[in-house]
Amino acid sequence: MKQYLDLCQRILDEGVIKEDRTGTGTTSVFGHQMRFDLSEGFPMVTTKKLHMKSIIHELLWFLSGDTNVRYLQENGVRIWNEWADENGDLGPVYGSQWRSFTGRDGKTVDQIQWVIDEIKRNPDSRRLIVSAWNPAELDKMALPPCHLLFQFYVANGKLSCQLYQRSGDTFLGVPFNIASYALLTHMVAHVTGLEVGDFVHTIGDAHLYLNHIEQVKLQLTREPKPLPKLVLNPDVTSIFDFKYEDIEIVGYESHPHIKGEVAV
């Protein structure tokens, strides 16, 4: 995907060295946007192999409202292990905010159900937004949300989605985020009777950890391969009923995996 490789090249060319929470160090740019036409193929990075199983299970986990890593571990997904406590809990992270956002008055809102209902009721609304950024609960979270707000947009029978991500680990995290929100857009379009439009990915602090520089340079030498297709089970009518086997990526071909250490 040229859009992703262009981001990597921009960070290498223009990035500013910054200290970070993990002590690893980054090179960073501020404010970058990528746009993917979802009708042209499913946007999975092909210049290294992605573990789509982890992406699908993580999204299903978010949508369930769960915030304990047990489900992920039972399905061979370890991407949240470093942040979980001894009981596997992460505090009120994404799933909690998506499905039971708690306001100052103690009222909870199922934002996913609300936004799907609102797309059906009022597709021209400019308020089709889900936020995972709850300032009152940030200190209870194992990790404050990086991909923190997304907005849907309906035009000409097509559903588009824009994500705002405050912080993007461009080598390890951003390819996952692109695929995850593209999948979410397909799923929401499916249950609202719409076609897919664009996925727009806006990143605030887009960075490369300094111990990922050589891996990214290797990726930039590789020619992107054709994008795969996404197939969803047509019998599923509720977004909360999707299971792993209802989601299939067809024709994914990639260059070999490139290892990179996670900065915790």
Curated annotation (Swiss-Prot):
GO cellular component terms attached to this protein's record: cytosol
SUPFAM superfamilies attached to this UniProt entry: Thymidylate synthase/dCMP hydroxymethylase
Binding residue positions for dUMP: 21, 126-127, 166-169, 177, 207-209
List of catalytic residues: 146
InterPro entries: Thymidate_synth/dCMP_Mease, Thymidate_synth/dCMP_Mease_dom, Thymidate_synth/dCMP_Mease_sf, Thymidylate_synthase, Thymidylate_synthase_AS
Domain of life: Bacteria
Record-listed E.C. numbers: 2.1.1.45
Alphabetical GO biological process terms: dTMP biosynthetic process; dTTP biosynthetic process; methylation
Entry GO MF terms: thymidylate synthase activity
Binding site for (6R)-5,10-methylene-5,6,7,8-tetrahydrofolate: 51, 169, 263
Compartment(s) where it occurs, according to its Swiss-Prot or TrEMBL record: Cytoplasm
Subunit composition and interactions: Homodimer.
Protein known as: Thymidylate synthase
Annotated organism of origin: Brevibacillus brevis (strain 47 / JCM 6285 / NBRC 100599)
Lineage: Bacteria, Bacillati, Bacillota, Bacilli, Bacillales
